[in-house]
Regions:
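Conserved beta-strand termini and adjacent loop/short-helix elements that scaffold enzyme active sites
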Residues: 35-37, 95-99, 149, 191-193, ...
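A short acidic, glycine-rich active-site loop
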Residues: 56-73
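Structural beta-alpha unit
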Residues: 42, 68, 72-115, 213-243, ...
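Short amphipathic alpha-helical segments at helix-loop
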Residues: 62-66, 97, 161
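Small/aliphatic-rich secondary-structure junction motif
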Residues: 1-61, 141, 154-222, 240
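Gly/Ser-rich helix-loop-strand patches that form or flank binding pockets
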Residues: 14, 18-20, 25, 94, ...
Length: 278
């Protein structure tokens, strides 16, 4: 894996999320491309809201001129991005994307191996819950796998594969494995939470056989009950694990999760979440 994108609102850079991004780049000896979304043409946020966002990111701006405010924040955040990358021994590349944010991100993802984004990234004039509409659209339309960044990063303990026997959940497992061969020594947990429609014994055997060709330490956990609540109970304590989930479609989560299951997971867990779709 050579091209990793870090997507951010140019006005507000989540510096803490860069720790995980730099960890990945160090692991794979990759450069990190910072995608700074300037949203110059259809800015819906008033100056007051932009100033609040900038302040949350550590920048105190005095001007009420939207263009001047954006330019100052973009310049300061690009410098911060470069400083953090240099501190971590990572080569940081900057793209200033000045068009429509969603369109810019999708085009960038077409020519990348992996995209990293914070679940709170938003260009709406209204306060939004997590994940925001912008992030949900990115998950649905991105043309490479996406990782929802953790709030903070203190190291990687285990990989958690969510599995229900469907092709999309297996596709996500395979995509993660192909992108992260350096993690073959990391313990893998295959988690299945089902209230019905269990994977067949033959399917589970084939998955085990495939996983043993790629990983050295594998655990299997099967639980009964309500998928949404049981899944959250199982994932929340895993503070140093990365969670791998299947396809995120615009109308449905076509693996273990439907939209009512996916949203609570992305809202509540603080771990990195890897999402891939066909």
């Amino acid at each position: 894996m050579k091209k990793i994108l870090y997507v951010t609102d140019a006005v507000k850079l989540e510096a803490s999320a860069l720790d995980f991004a730099c960890y990945l780049c160090t692991l794979f000896r990759s450069k990190l491309t910072g995608i700074f979304l300037e949203n110059l043409y259809k800015e819906a946020r008033p100056a007051k809201m932009l100033k609040e966002a900038a302040l949350e990111g550590g920048i105190n701006v005095q001007t009420d001129n939207t263009d001047e405010l954006k330019e100052q924040c973009t310049s300061d955040n690009i410098q911060l991005f470069k400083t953090i990358c240099e501190k971590n021994g990572v080569t940081g590349i900057v793209h200033r994307d000045k068009g429509i944010p969603l369109e810019d991100v999708i085009i960038e993802s077409r020519y990348a191996d992996l995209l990293l984004i914070d679940a709170s990234t938003s260009f709406s004039a209204q306060k939004e819950s997590v994940p925001t509409r912008f992030v949900t659209d990115v998950l649905a339309d991105a043309e490479c796998p996406v990782i929802i960044l953790p709030e903070s990063f203190e190291g990687l303990n285990k990989i958690v594969f969510t599995y229900d026997g469907r092709s999309s959940s297996v596709f996500a497992i395979k995509q993660f494995t192909y992108l992260f061969p350096e993690l073959r020594e990391t313990t893998v947990v295959v988690m299945t939470v089902m209230d019905n429609n269990r994977p067949s014994p033959e399917e589970k055997y084939k998955l085990k056989e495939w996983l043993h060709d790629h990983y050295t330490n594998i655990e299997f956990i099967e639980q009964d009950g309500n998928v949404k609540y049981q899944l959250l109970d199982s994932l929340l304590p895993r503070t140093k694990d990365i969670i791998v989930m299947g396809a995120f479609g615009r109308n449905a989560f076509s693996t273990l999760f439907n939209p009512s299951h996916a949203t609570p997971v992305l809202k509540l867990v603080t771990q990195p979440v890897f999402i891939a779709h066909h």
